[in-house]
């Protein structure tokens, strides 16, 4: 009883598949596997023989021939003259580029041109080494401080700030020169001479008013230039006095 039910269901399934296969390919029934359908083994062999033929074909849609979906070859023929229908590195589609980018992101060592990442980095650094931004950014070098005294350089880190100030205030000891005198004595003599000059200048300032001879207003007055012989005494008379004298002379002449 179970075998008869199985055979009936298998027969119905085979009939359905055969009907579809007849529409797709009529020679499926003419094969040797589908000649004898009485046994279960022959039925399964016929199903296996017709199944690859059905899967290889495109699905059949109802309607006329003009309503069927176009095949791949006419589609390629229609879009072949467009830029996105061509194959190539420069004219590849956006989907292929996206797939390449995803593959590159998944595999860090993969590049589309097949070049190893180490070689690419070397080439990039070589081609951009003449640019300022192509050089690696390193730590800025600080200028080296040069001290006049060797003790200050040695004690720059060992002594605190107060000791540094004391060291900067002190001067190195006088070293004996080739003539037997120390540089310290020469410095003391120069300091004494400068102090004497300052003292003399202060005394001169106390004696009289300080004249700024190097300025224009430090020169003697106009009346004192050239010993005073260029100016006449009449010019010193006021103008009002001259007018009075002239009026008196005119009145005296008229009275005569």
Curated annotation (Swiss-Prot):
SMART domains: ACTH_domain, NPP, Op_neuropeptide
Coiled-coil region(s): none
Cellular compartment(s): Secreted
Modification Phenylalanine amide, positions: 87
GO biological process, one term: regulation of corticosterone secretion
Superkingdom classification of source: Eukaryota
Disulfide bonds: 28-50
Modified-residue entries (N-acetylserine), positions: 125
InterPro entries: Mcrtin_ACTH_cent, Melanocortin_N, Opioid_neuropept, PMOC, POMC-derived_peptides
GO molecular function, one term: hormone activity
Glycosylation sites: 71, 91
Main subcellular location of this protein, as a coarse class: secreted
Family that this chain belongs to: Belongs to the POMC family.
Biological function: ACTH stimulates the adrenal glands to release cortisol.
Name of the featured protein: Pro-opiomelanocortin
Organism of derivation: Cavia porcellus
Gene: POMC
């Amino acid at each position: 009883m179970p075998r008869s039910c199985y055979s009936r269901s298998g027969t119905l399934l085979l009939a359905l598949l055969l009907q579809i296969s007849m529409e797709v390919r009529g020679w499926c029934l003419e094969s040797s596997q589908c000649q004898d359908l009485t046994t279960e083994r022959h039925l399964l062999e016929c199903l296996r023989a017709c199944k690859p033929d059905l899967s290889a074909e495109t699905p059949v849609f109802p309607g006329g021939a003009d309503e069927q979906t176009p095949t791949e070859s006419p589609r390629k023929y229609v879009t072949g003259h467009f830029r996105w229908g061509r194959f190539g590195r420069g004219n590849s589609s956006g989907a292929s580029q996206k797939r390449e980018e995803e593959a590159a992101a998944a595999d860090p060592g993969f590049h589309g041109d097949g070049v190893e990442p180490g070689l690419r980095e070397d080439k990039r650094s070589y081609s951009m080494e003449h640019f300022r931004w192509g050089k690696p950014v390193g730590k800025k070098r600080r200028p080296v401080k040069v001290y006049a005294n060797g003790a200050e350089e040695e004690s720059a880190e060992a002594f605190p700030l107060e000791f540094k100030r004391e060291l900067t205030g002190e001067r190195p000891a006088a070293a004996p020169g080739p003539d037997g005198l120390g540089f310290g004595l020469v410095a003391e003599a120069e300091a004494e001479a400068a102090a004497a000059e300052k003292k003399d200048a202060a005394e001169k300032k106390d004696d009289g008013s300080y004249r700024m001879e190097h300025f224009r207003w430090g020169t003697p007055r106009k009346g004192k230039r050239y010993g005073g012989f260029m100016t006449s005494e009449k010019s010193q008379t006021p103008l009002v006095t001259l007018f009075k004298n002239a009026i008196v002379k005119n009145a005296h002449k008229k009275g005569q």
